[in-house]
C-alpha cells in the first residue's frame, strides 16, 4: 500500500498514478508496478443501512430535519461510493425517523 505524504491517507491506483483524496498524486514507476498487483476487482454493491431501532445508540447533532423541522438527528458515516471518494453522512430525525444524506 502507498500512503500519502501530505495527509497520511491510503492512496489508490488510477490512470497510471497513485491518487489521494486530498488531491496529492504520485506517478506509478516501473519499480512500483513490480511491487503491486491487483488480486481482485470488486464491484460496488448496495447495502442495507439499518433494519431496526439500533440507530438509537448513535451520536446526535443539531441539524434541521427537512420533513418535520425537528432540530436533532442521529448521524453516521458510510462509504457508499468509490474508496477514493469521501464518505456519505447520513442523518435520521429523532422525532419522525426520516433519514436523509449529505455528500461532501
Curated annotation (Swiss-Prot):
GO molecular function terms attached to this record: DNA binding; DNA-directed RNA polymerase activity; zinc ion binding
SUPFAM superfamilies found in the cross-reference section: Zinc beta-ribbon (SSF57783)
Segments forming C4-type zinc fingers: 4-22
Residues that bind Zn(2+) 1: 4, 7, 20, 22
Record has Ribosomal protein as a keyword: no
Annotated residues for binding of Zn(2+) 2: 65, 68, 93, 96
Keyword line: DNA-binding, DNA-directed RNA polymerase, Metal-binding, Transcription, Transcription regulation, Zinc, Zinc-finger
SMART domains noted in UniProt: RPOL9, ZnF_C2C2
InterPro entries on file: DNA-dir_RNA_pol-M_15_CS, Rpa12/Rpb9/Rpc10/TFS, TFS, Zn_ribbon_RPB9, Znf_TFIIS
Entries under Pfam families matching the protein: Zn_ribbon_RPB9, Zn_ribbon_TFIIS
Zinc finger map (TFIIS-type): 61-101
GO biological process assignments: DNA-templated transcription; regulation of DNA-templated transcription
Record bears the keyword Plastid: no
GO cellular component: DNA-directed RNA polymerase complex
UniProt function note: Induces RNA cleavage activity in the RNA polymerase. In its presence, the cleavage activity of the RNA polymerase truncates the RNA back to position +15 in a stepwise manner by releasing mainly dinucleotides from the 3'-end of the nascent RNA. The truncated RNAs are able to continue elongation. Involved in transcriptional proofreading and fidelity. Misincorporation of nucleotides during elongation of transcription leads to arrested elongation complexes which are rescued by TFS-promoted removal of a dinucleotide from the 3'-end.
PANTHER family assigned to the protein according to its UniProt record, in alphabetical order: DNA-DIRECTED RNA POLYMERASE (PTHR11239), DNA-DIRECTED RNA POLYMERASE III SUBUNIT RPC10 (PTHR11239:SF12)
Family: Belongs to the archaeal RpoM/eukaryotic RPA12/RPB9/RPC11 RNA polymerase family.
Protein name: Transcription factor S
This protein's encoding gene: tfs
Amino acid at each position: 500500500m502507498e500512503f500519502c505524504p501530505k495527509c497520511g491517507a491510503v492512496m489508490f491506483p488510477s490512470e497510471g498514478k497513485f491518487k489521494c483524496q486530498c488531491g496529492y498524486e504520485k506517478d506509478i514507476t516501473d519499480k512500483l508496478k513490480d511491487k503491486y498487483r491487483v488480486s481482485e476487482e470488486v464491484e460496488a454493491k448496495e447495502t442495507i443501512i439499518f433494519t431496526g431501532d439500533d440507530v438509537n445508540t448513535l451520536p446526535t447533532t443539531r441539524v434541521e430535519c427537512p420533513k418535520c423541522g425537528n432540530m436533532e438527528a442521529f448521524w453516521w458515516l458510510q462509504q457508499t461510493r468509490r474508496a477514493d471518494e469521501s464518505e456519505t453522512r447520513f442523518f435520521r430525525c429523532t422525532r419522525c425517523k426520516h433519514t436523509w444524506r449529505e455528500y461532501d
